[in-house]
Protein backbone atom coordinates (compact mmCIF):
# COMPACT_ATOMS: atom_id res chain seq x y z
CA UNK A 1 0.00 0.00 0.00
CA UNK A 2 1.18 3.49 -0.81
CA UNK A 3 0.13 7.12 -1.00
CA UNK A 4 -0.79 8.30 -4.48
CA UNK A 5 -0.61 12.04 -5.02
CA UNK A 6 -3.17 13.18 -7.60
CA UNK A 7 -1.09 16.25 -8.38
CA UNK A 8 1.93 17.33 -10.36
CA UNK A 9 2.79 19.98 -7.76
CA UNK A 10 6.48 19.75 -6.84
CA UNK A 11 5.70 21.52 -3.55
CA UNK A 12 3.14 18.89 -2.49
CA UNK A 13 5.57 16.15 -3.39
CA UNK A 14 8.37 17.83 -1.39
CA UNK A 15 6.13 18.11 1.67
CA UNK A 16 5.48 14.37 1.61
CA UNK A 17 9.14 13.60 0.84
CA UNK A 18 10.34 15.70 3.78
CA UNK A 19 7.82 13.84 5.97
CA UNK A 20 9.31 10.47 4.99
CA UNK A 21 6.82 9.53 2.25
CA UNK A 22 7.70 8.79 -1.37
CA UNK A 23 4.31 9.10 -3.06
CA UNK A 24 3.40 7.71 -6.42
CA UNK A 25 2.67 10.74 -8.62
CA UNK A 26 -0.41 10.53 -10.85
CA UNK A 27 -1.53 14.01 -11.96
CA UNK A 28 -5.29 14.32 -12.34
CA UNK A 29 -6.74 15.47 -15.64
CA UNK A 30 -9.49 17.81 -14.46
CA UNK A 31 -11.02 20.78 -16.26
CA UNK A 32 -10.53 23.21 -13.38
CA UNK A 33 -11.98 26.16 -15.28
CA UNK A 34 -15.26 24.32 -15.96
CA UNK A 35 -15.45 23.17 -12.35
CA UNK A 36 -14.76 26.69 -11.07
CA UNK A 37 -17.52 28.00 -13.32
CA UNK A 38 -19.97 25.41 -11.94
CA UNK A 39 -19.02 26.41 -8.37
CA UNK A 40 -19.54 30.13 -8.95
CA UNK A 41 -21.06 31.65 -5.82
CA UNK A 42 -19.89 28.86 -3.51
CA UNK A 43 -17.89 29.58 -0.36
CA UNK A 44 -14.11 29.72 -0.93
CA UNK A 45 -13.51 26.68 1.30
CA UNK A 46 -16.08 24.67 -0.65
CA UNK A 47 -14.46 25.61 -3.96
CA UNK A 48 -11.01 24.32 -2.97
CA UNK A 49 -12.51 21.20 -1.38
CA UNK A 50 -14.43 20.41 -4.58
CA UNK A 51 -11.35 20.98 -6.75
CA UNK A 52 -9.32 18.65 -4.53
CA UNK A 53 -12.12 16.07 -4.57
CA UNK A 54 -12.42 16.15 -8.35
CA UNK A 55 -8.69 15.45 -8.68
CA UNK A 56 -8.72 12.57 -6.20
CA UNK A 57 -11.87 11.04 -7.72
CA UNK A 58 -10.34 10.98 -11.20
CA UNK A 59 -7.24 9.11 -9.98
CA UNK A 60 -8.67 6.85 -7.22
CA UNK A 61 -10.26 4.18 -9.47
CA UNK A 62 -6.78 3.27 -10.75
CA UNK A 63 -5.53 2.63 -7.18
CA UNK A 64 -8.26 0.80 -5.21
CA UNK A 65 -5.83 -0.51 -2.58
CA UNK A 66 -3.94 2.73 -2.04
CA UNK A 67 -4.57 6.07 -0.34
CA UNK A 68 -5.15 8.76 -2.96
CA UNK A 69 -4.67 12.42 -2.05
CA UNK A 70 -5.95 15.34 -4.10
CA UNK A 71 -5.21 18.94 -3.21
CA UNK A 72 -5.90 22.45 -4.37
CA UNK A 73 -4.93 25.85 -2.98
CA UNK A 74 -6.22 29.36 -3.60
CA UNK A 75 -5.61 32.75 -2.02
CA UNK A 76 -8.50 34.76 -0.62
CA UNK A 77 -7.68 38.47 -0.65
CA UNK A 78 -10.12 41.38 -0.57
CA UNK A 79 -13.03 38.88 -0.87
CA UNK A 80 -11.59 37.57 -4.16
CA UNK A 81 -10.37 34.00 -4.61
CA UNK A 82 -7.18 33.76 -6.68
CA UNK A 83 -5.47 30.73 -8.14
CA UNK A 84 -2.26 30.66 -10.16
CA UNK A 85 -1.32 33.84 -12.03
CA UNK A 86 0.28 31.96 -15.00
CA UNK A 87 1.90 35.11 -16.47
CA UNK A 88 4.58 37.58 -15.42
CA UNK A 89 2.15 40.49 -15.82
CA UNK A 90 -0.55 38.89 -13.65
CA UNK A 91 2.06 38.03 -11.02
CA UNK A 92 3.28 41.64 -10.83
CA UNK A 93 -0.28 42.96 -10.65
CA UNK A 94 -1.18 40.57 -7.83
CA UNK A 95 1.94 41.36 -5.85
CA UNK A 96 1.28 45.08 -6.07
CA UNK A 97 -2.19 44.37 -4.67
CA UNK A 98 -1.13 42.00 -1.90
CA UNK A 99 2.10 43.60 -0.65
CA UNK A 100 1.65 44.98 2.85
CA UNK A 101 -1.71 43.21 3.13
CA UNK A 102 -3.08 40.15 4.84
CA UNK A 103 -4.73 37.31 2.94
CA UNK A 104 -5.88 33.75 3.62
CA UNK A 105 -4.42 30.77 1.79
CA UNK A 106 -7.04 28.01 1.65
CA UNK A 107 -5.99 24.47 0.80
CA UNK A 108 -8.53 21.79 0.00
CA UNK A 109 -7.73 18.14 0.63
CA UNK A 110 -9.48 14.99 -0.54
CA UNK A 111 -8.23 11.65 0.74
CA UNK A 112 -9.75 8.50 -0.75
CA UNK A 113 -9.20 4.89 0.27
CA UNK A 114 -11.54 2.39 -1.34
CA UNK A 115 -15.08 3.65 -0.75
CA UNK A 116 -14.08 6.04 2.02
CA UNK A 117 -13.74 9.72 1.14
CA UNK A 118 -12.53 12.44 3.50
CA UNK A 119 -12.67 16.06 2.35
CA UNK A 120 -11.34 18.93 4.44
CA UNK A 121 -9.84 22.37 4.03
CA UNK A 122 -7.17 24.23 5.94
CA UNK A 123 -6.86 28.02 6.13
CA UNK A 124 -3.75 29.99 7.00
CA UNK A 125 -3.40 33.76 7.25
CA UNK A 126 -0.50 35.27 5.32
CA UNK A 127 1.00 38.68 6.12
CA UNK A 128 2.74 39.93 2.99
CA UNK A 129 5.77 42.20 3.23
CA UNK A 130 5.99 45.64 1.65
CA UNK A 131 8.02 44.25 -1.25
CA UNK A 132 9.69 46.80 -3.52
CA UNK A 133 8.70 47.16 -7.17
CA UNK A 134 12.15 45.89 -8.20
CA UNK A 135 11.84 42.78 -6.02
CA UNK A 136 8.32 42.10 -7.31
CA UNK A 137 9.51 42.30 -10.92
CA UNK A 138 12.57 40.15 -10.28
CA UNK A 139 10.47 37.60 -8.42
CA UNK A 140 8.05 37.44 -11.36
CA UNK A 141 11.00 37.17 -13.77
CA UNK A 142 12.30 34.15 -11.83
CA UNK A 143 9.23 32.23 -12.97
CA UNK A 144 8.80 30.71 -9.53
CA UNK A 145 5.43 32.26 -8.61
CA UNK A 146 3.71 31.85 -11.99
CA UNK A 147 2.25 28.41 -11.21
CA UNK A 148 1.69 28.92 -7.48
CA UNK A 149 -1.59 29.71 -5.77
CA UNK A 150 -1.47 33.33 -4.66
CA UNK A 151 1.63 33.97 -6.79
CA UNK A 152 4.05 33.07 -4.00
CA UNK A 153 6.01 30.31 -2.35
CA UNK A 154 6.81 30.16 1.33
CA UNK A 155 9.71 27.75 1.05
CA UNK A 156 11.79 29.39 -1.69
CA UNK A 157 12.34 32.90 -3.11
CA UNK A 158 8.87 33.99 -2.04
CA UNK A 159 9.85 33.51 1.59
CA UNK A 160 11.67 36.85 1.38
CA UNK A 161 8.33 38.61 0.99
CA UNK A 162 6.25 36.95 3.71
CA UNK A 163 6.39 38.72 7.08
CA UNK A 164 4.46 36.06 9.00
CA UNK A 165 1.84 33.37 8.84
CA UNK A 166 -0.85 32.30 11.28
CA UNK A 167 -1.60 28.61 10.90
CA UNK A 168 -0.13 25.51 9.32
CA UNK A 169 3.02 26.16 7.24
CA UNK A 170 2.67 22.87 5.33
CA UNK A 171 -0.80 23.92 4.20
CA UNK A 172 0.65 27.12 2.75
CA UNK A 173 3.15 25.06 0.79
CA UNK A 174 0.31 22.96 -0.62
CA UNK A 175 -0.63 20.03 1.63
CA UNK A 176 -1.45 20.12 5.33
CA UNK A 177 0.31 17.29 7.13
CA UNK A 178 -2.06 17.64 10.12
CA UNK A 179 -5.09 17.25 7.81
CA UNK A 180 -3.55 14.22 6.09
CA UNK A 181 -2.58 12.66 9.44
CA UNK A 182 -6.11 13.04 10.81
CA UNK A 183 -7.53 11.51 7.63
CA UNK A 184 -5.14 8.56 7.84
CA UNK A 185 -6.18 7.97 11.46
CA UNK A 186 -9.85 8.04 10.45
CA UNK A 187 -9.07 5.46 7.77
CA UNK A 188 -7.39 3.21 10.35
CA UNK A 189 -3.77 3.94 9.41
CA UNK A 190 -0.84 5.51 11.19
CA UNK A 191 1.20 8.20 9.46
CA UNK A 192 4.29 6.04 10.04
CA UNK A 193 2.73 3.22 7.97
CA UNK A 194 3.73 5.23 4.89
CA UNK A 195 7.23 6.29 5.88
CA UNK A 196 9.98 5.04 3.56
CA UNK A 197 12.59 4.23 6.18
From Swiss-Prot:
Q: Which UniProt keywords apply?
A: Cytoplasm, Hydrolase, Nucleotide metabolism
Asked if Mitochondrion is a keyword of the record, the answer is no
Localization terms from the record: Cytoplasm
Q: Per the UniProt record, which EC number(s) apply here?
A: 3.6.1.9
Q: Which GO terms describe its molecular function?
A: nucleoside triphosphate diphosphatase activity
**Cellular component aspect of the GO annotation:** cytoplasm
Q: What are its GO biological-process terms?
A: nucleotide metabolic process
SUPFAM superfamilies the record matches: ITPase-like
The name under which this protein is listed is Nucleoside triphosphate pyrophosphatase
Organism from which the protein derives: Corynebacterium glutamicum (strain ATCC 13032 / DSM 20300 / JCM 1318 / BCRC 11384 / CCUG 27702 / LMG 3730 / NBRC 12168 / NCIMB 10025 / NRRL B-2784 / 534)
Lineage, highest ranks first: Bacteria, Bacillati, Actinomycetota, Actinomycetes, Mycobacteriales
Amino acid sequence: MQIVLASQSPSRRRILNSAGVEPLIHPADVDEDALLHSLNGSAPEEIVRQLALAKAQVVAPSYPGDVVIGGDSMLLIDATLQGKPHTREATIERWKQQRGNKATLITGHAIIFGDEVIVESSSTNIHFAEASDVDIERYADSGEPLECAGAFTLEALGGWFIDSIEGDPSSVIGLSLPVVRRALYRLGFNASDFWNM
